[in-house]
C-alpha cells in the first residue's frame, strides 16, 4: 500500500523531530515505513568518532513535532549490494558463540573459565567446551581451575602458545583488579585529605 502524498519522507532528506520526552533529534532519512510509522535517521556519532554515524529508529507515534529541513526530490542512490554469504557466515558464527557460552553456563563453568575461553577464542577460533574443560585445536585441554599448570597436551608449539595466552590472560585480569582497587581508593584518599 503506497503512502498518501505528503505523509512520507524521502530517503536523503534532512529531518528534525521532537520526541515525547522533549528530545530533539535531527538527521538524514535512511528509511521510512509508512504502515508502521517507523523512521530511520542517520545522525552524527554519539561517540564522536569521524566516519561513524548512529542510526536511530524512531516511532513517529511518539513524536510531537516533525520538520523537514531539506527535502530531497531527486531519486535516491541505489542501495548497496549485500554479501549474503558473508552475512550468513557471520550470523552462524555468532550463533555458535552464543550456544557455546550458554553451554558453559549450563555446565556450571566458573566465570573465570568463561572469560578465559573468550580470550583464547579471540586468538584461536578452534576451541570448544568438553564438559567443564576447554579444548584448544584438539591438542590442548585446560581443566578447572583453568591456570597455566592446568594446560595439558603433547609438548610442542600448540601447548606452549596456549600456555602463553592463559598466562597473559591472568596477568591482564590481575592488572585490571589492581587498577580498579586504586580507582576505588582514590575518592577515599581525597575525602581524608579534605577533612
From Swiss-Prot:
The gene is LSM12. The modification Phosphothreonine is found at residue 75. It is found in: Cytoplasm. This is Protein LSM12. Residues 80-174 form the AD domain. One of its GO terms (cellular component) is cytoplasm. Its main location: cytoplasm. It comes from Homo sapiens (Human). The lineage of its organism: Eukaryota, Metazoa, Chordata, Craniata, Vertebrata. It comes from the Eukaryota. Found in a complex with LSM12, TPCN1 and TPCN2. Interacts with TPCN2. Nicotinic acid adenine dinucleotide phosphate (NAADP) binding protein. Confers NAADP sensitivity to the two pore channel complex (TPCs) by acting as TPC accessory protein necessary for NAADP-evoked Ca(2+) release. Residues 2-72 form the Sm domain. Keywords: Acetylation, Cytoplasm, Phosphoprotein. Residues 4-67 are annotated as: Required for NAADP and TPCN2 binding. SMART domains: AD. CDD domains: LSm12_N (cd01735). It holds the Pfam family LSM12_LSM. The modification N-acetylalanine is found at residue 2. GO terms for molecular function: RNA binding. Belongs to the LSM12 family.
